[in-house]
Amino acid sequence: MSIRLTNISKKFGQFQALSPLNLDIQEGEMIGLLGPSGSGKTTLLRIIAGLEGADSGHIHFGNRDVTQVHVRDRRVGFVFQNYALFRHMTVADNVAFGLEVIPKKQRPSAAEIQKRVSHLLEMVQLGHLAQRYPEQLSGGQKQRIALARALATQPEVLLLDEPFGALDAKVRKELRRWLRSLHDELKFTSVFVTHDQDEALELSDRVVVMSNGNIEQVNTPIELYAQPNSRFVFDFLGNVNRFEANWQQNRWTNGDAFIVPPEQTPLQQNGALYVRSHELALADKPNSQAHIPFTIVAITPIGAEVRVELAPIGWQSEELWEAKFTHHHLQELGLQKGSVVYATPRTGYFFGKQGDGSPIRQSWPFLPPGSLAFDI
């Protein structure tokens, strides 16, 4: 079932929760609504569900205008972050609940309900827990039961509000993979809310990035990461360092630091160069391409990677910089906390001083022999 949102807006008192926005969701897509708290993503999800009314605009499920249709008649399944399971009911009864409260004329037979519940529990790999109660389940098991209950009524659209937010990191990762696999198997249209960038990029066919009630960008995870269209999107996707640059003497400067742009660059202006943590090289000496001195303030192993936190020396940055390396690469570099190092960007994304529009990608693929004091 496709979803089309046209000119949707919402106010709570004087607060503009959603500015007029438009969004088309194709049948069978999994869409992630990503943004910080207060961005409007949950309000938008609730409006799609019918739990909130829009102040303006229209919502279509396929060719059906559901703008004024009550939530019970929209054929929507909803999964909450806190599961919302009934503690006094068994797992099987929780899954069956949505079917048993359907008006009698439309309600499946008792045998059909039992058959559907058994099938759903097997599908979520929890058939052996049918007679247990929610308090006897783990967080991950509860979320699977909540999903099975949402699917029991065979909804046209599945909506999920931060479905894995209450779970630990390992369980979240496992459930993300499981949900994506289930979605690909059943091919239902689904929309979920998250503030977790990794979750949005891993699960979504397309990501909708939101801020202050507006849609900032809609794209596939790969394209969104490769081509963020604004400073906000770049900042929110995380793991990015920002060099506030003044154009002087054919290079970008900031205090004692400088970066020489690639040859023939048209960007002879002030602005900001964004450099991702894995696109930053470190060495114990500066070079002709860049002079960006730091003190290493922390070295933190994170799984297969090591995060190096860097404090600027002689120039200004609002935040510490980060560089990421493999454990092997870190050993080769011989970095230690308290050491002075010099950074060089491999790739950067330049925004002009106004910060409007898409960034211009800058790459330093090679330099003339002898121009570097170390190999990048």
From Swiss-Prot:
SMART domains listed in its UniProt record: AAA
Entry keywords, A to Z: ATP-binding, Cell inner membrane, Cell membrane, Membrane, Nucleotide-binding, Sulfate transport, Translocase, Transport
Mode of membrane association: Peripheral membrane protein
GO cellular component, one term: ATP-binding cassette (ABC) transporter complex
GO molecular function, one term: ATP hydrolysis activity
Reactions catalysed, as given in the entry: sulfate(out) + ATP + H2O = sulfate(in) + ADP + phosphate + H(+); thiosulfate(out) + ATP + H2O = thiosulfate(in) + ADP + phosphate + H(+)
EC number(s) recorded for this UniProt protein: 7.3.2.3
Highest taxon in the source lineage: Bacteria
Keyword Aminoacyl-tRNA synthetase in annotation: no
Gene3D superfamilies from the UniProt entry: P-loop containing nucleotide triphosphate hydrolases (3.40.50.300)
Location(s) in or outside the cell: Cell inner membrane
Disulfide-bond pairs as recorded: none
Domain ABC transporter: start-end pairs: 3-237
Pfam families in the cross-refs: ABC_tran, TOBE_3
Protein family per UniProt: Belongs to the ABC transporter superfamily. Sulfate/tungstate importer (TC 3.A.1.6) family.
Quaternary structure annotation from Swiss-Prot or TrEMBL: The complex is composed of two ATP-binding proteins (CysA), two transmembrane proteins (CysT and CysW) and a solute-binding protein (CysP).
Keyword Methyltransferase: no
Gene: cysA1
Function: Part of the ABC transporter complex CysAWTP involved in sulfate/thiosulfate import. Responsible for energy coupling to the transport system.
Protein name: Sulfate/thiosulfate import ATP-binding protein CysA 1
Binding site residues for ATP: G35, P36, S37, G38, S39, G40, K41, T42
InterPro entries assigned to the protein according to its UniProt record, in alphabetical order: AAA+_ATPase (IPR003593), ABC_SmlMolc_Importer (IPR050093), ABC_transporter-like_ATP-bd (IPR003439), ABC_transporter-like_CS (IPR017871), Mo/tungstate-bd_C_term_dom (IPR008995), P-loop_NTPase (IPR027417), Sulph_transpt1 (IPR005666), TOBE-like (IPR024765)
GO annotation terms (biological process): sulfate transmembrane transport
